[in-house]
Amino acid sequence: MTRAFNFSAGPATLPESVLRQAQAEMVEWNGVGASIVEISHRSADFMAVAAAAEADLRSLLSIPDDYAVLFTAGGATTIQALLPLNFAAPGQAADYVITGHWGKTAIKQAATSVDARIAADAQADGFVDIPPAASWTLSPHSAYVHITANETIHGVEFRDTPDVGTLPLFADFSSSIASEPLDISRYGLIYAGAQKNLGPVGISVVIVRRDLLERAGQPRADIFNYASHAARDSMLNTPPTWNWYVLGLTVKWMLEQGGVQEFARRNAEKAALVYGAIDGSGGFYRNLIKPAVRSRMNIPFFLPDEQLDALFVSESKAAGLLALKGHKAVGGIRASLYNAMPVAGAQALAAFMHDFQQRHG
């Protein structure tokens, strides 16, 4: 069976070689006589899997030694709720920059336990641009400044790290982590749900400067305490072992492919192919985002009417191009071009777009 090109925004496409390896090792792993999903998370065998995943992730992202790496169950929304509990004192403010749907989600999750202030909000302009950092209204004693590095629904991406002075910068990198080189030392904390660039759904990564873990935060159960998770190597409770294992395979695959420098090159090439098809269509396809902040990972676009949108989704699926329907919040079409999407997938989509316009334009 030939695999289609899967443009899903998440859970997203995984490298076929990773899927094949996971399939081969599902029933019996590494000569232990049992599946990886059956062995204890505290066994020497799984501890080696976990240690290798962290070592490879540190190598892939050039994570400094003064940053802890946590592997946590669940997704980014859970992390958003836990950030103020861990890093904001009772009554302290935290600043949020809203550049799309997920920025709104982040502040909503935090608002129950912190004075969540909007430092900048791009909604009035339809989330088509990112307000310059110099225009943000930051609280001088804020616990942190939170941004969403890439908005998967609206297709807006920070192309540079904003300067927030001495305040810790926290960022949701769920959809763009490992897509290009990143100077992690400019952030206090970054986090990412795995299901876009790092692996399967159900596990997330938190990369946090160790001195921030010393903050008292707010009263919380130990299971919600990131310092406790760091002290126990992310095994305070039973972790999602299968997800952690596949994440490790995916990170190793990225290293073998050439690392973040190589994926930056591929991702730029893929994005150029799809944006080229949009911009060269004479208005048949429309992307509303300001070019300077267009996402490389998630490209939303619109056809002249909703009937053509539906026909595009139907015909593209028949052509082996899956999950191109836009998010219900905005409609239209959306192509997600994460690391595991090969350049051939973007080429196939661009060719289909040209053919579709020739037949229906």
UniProtKB/Swiss-Prot annotation:
Pathway(s) of this molecule: Amino-acid biosynthesis; L-serine biosynthesis; L-serine from 3-phospho-D-glycerate: step 2/3; Cofactor biosynthesis; pyridoxine 5'-phosphate biosynthesis; pyridoxine 5'-phosphate from D-erythrose 4-phosphate: step 3/5
Main location: cytoplasm
Gene Ontology BP term (one): pyridoxine biosynthetic process
Family, as annotated: Belongs to the class-V pyridoxal-phosphate-dependent aminotransferase family. SerC subfamily.
Organism for this UniProt entry: Xanthomonas euvesicatoria pv. vesicatoria (strain 85-10) (Xanthomonas campestris pv. vesicatoria)
Co-factor binding details: Binds 1 pyridoxal phosphate per subunit.
The name this protein goes by in its record: Phosphoserine aminotransferase
Needed cofactors: pyridoxal 5'-phosphate
Binding site for L-glutamate: 42
Recorded superkingdom: Bacteria
Catalyzed chemical reaction(s): O-phospho-L-serine + 2-oxoglutarate = 3-phosphooxypyruvate + L-glutamate; 4-(phosphooxy)-L-threonine + 2-oxoglutarate = (R)-3-hydroxy-2-oxo-4-phosphooxybutanoate + L-glutamate
E.C. number(s) listed in UniProt: 2.6.1.52
SUBUNIT field: Homodimer.
Keywords, in A-Z order: Amino-acid biosynthesis, Aminotransferase, Cytoplasm, Pyridoxal phosphate, Pyridoxine biosynthesis, Serine biosynthesis, Transferase
Enzyme class label: transferase
UniProt-annotated location(s): Cytoplasm
Organism phylogeny: Bacteria, Pseudomonadati, Pseudomonadota, Gammaproteobacteria, Lysobacterales
